């Protein structure tokens, strides 16, 4: 099997799981408080930042500090548990497949899931910014190049974190211990 077919097999496995729904929940959870507390973006108290930048930063701070690491941990554990629950890893390892390619395919799927969550975060930002713009009569929508550049920086910073989480999840067989670390 070549690498792309291994990635395709891994993507088919997660299609039946609820990983995409699990990735959507933190995206929604992080932007609801921003809509509710939209009027606080105008109370800057001498901080030289515009309300629209404050809205953007406040919305993505929770994603960066907590939700992205938590989502990556959950995704790595779920990816490994789909293999272990149905003894799929034993079946895969009995085939003439390189274990290195198999691990790299899992890492690629994890990175694709993180990218999908980032795209959902961008979409949620623009939806919430449009709602708050309508509520406050002030334009909270930033230009797409600025938003995408910052989100790509967050995504690039999450790649080494995903590698560490996948390594820990692979080395520690119990899902409780791998989530705990």
Regions found by a protein language model. Give the residues of each.
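Aromatic- and glycine-rich beta-strand/loop motifs that create alpha-glucan
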Residues: 1-27
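Short loop-to-helix capping motifs
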Residues: 17-18, 98, 173-175
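Central hydrophobic cores of alpha-helical transmembrane segments
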Residues: 23-30, 177-181
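Secretory targeting signals
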Residues: 26-74, 104-173
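Transmembrane helix boundary and interhelical loop/hinge segments in multi-pass membrane proteins
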Residues: 74-93
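Helix-loop interface residues and adjacent transmembrane-helix termini in multi-pass membrane transporters
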Residues: 83, 96, 171-172
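Short helix-to-coil transition segments within interhelical loops
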Residues: 93-99
């Amino acid at each position: 099997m070549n690498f792309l077919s291994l990635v395709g097999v891994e993507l088919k496995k997660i299609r039946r799981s609820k990983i995409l729904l699990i990735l959507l929940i933190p995206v929604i959870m992080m932007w609801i408080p921003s809509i509710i507390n939209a009027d606080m973006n105008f109370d800057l108290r001498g901080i030289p930042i515009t309300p629209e930048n404050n809205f953007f930063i406040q919305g993505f701070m929770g994603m960066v500090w907590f939700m992205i690491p938590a989502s990556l941990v959950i995704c790595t554990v779920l990816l490994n548990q789909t293999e272990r629950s149905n003894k799929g890893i034993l079946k895969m390892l009995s085939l003439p497949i390189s274990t290195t390619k198999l691990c790299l395919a899992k890492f690629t799927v994890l990175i694709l899931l993180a990218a999908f969550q980032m795209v959902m975060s961008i979409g949620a930002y623009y939806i919430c910014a449009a709602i708050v713009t309508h509520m406050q009569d002030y334009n909270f929508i930033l230009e797409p190049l600025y938003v995408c550049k910052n989100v790509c920086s967050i995504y690039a910073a999450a790649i080494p974190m995903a590698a560490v989480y996948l390594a820990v999840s692979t080395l520690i067989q119990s899902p409780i211990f791998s989530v705990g670390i």
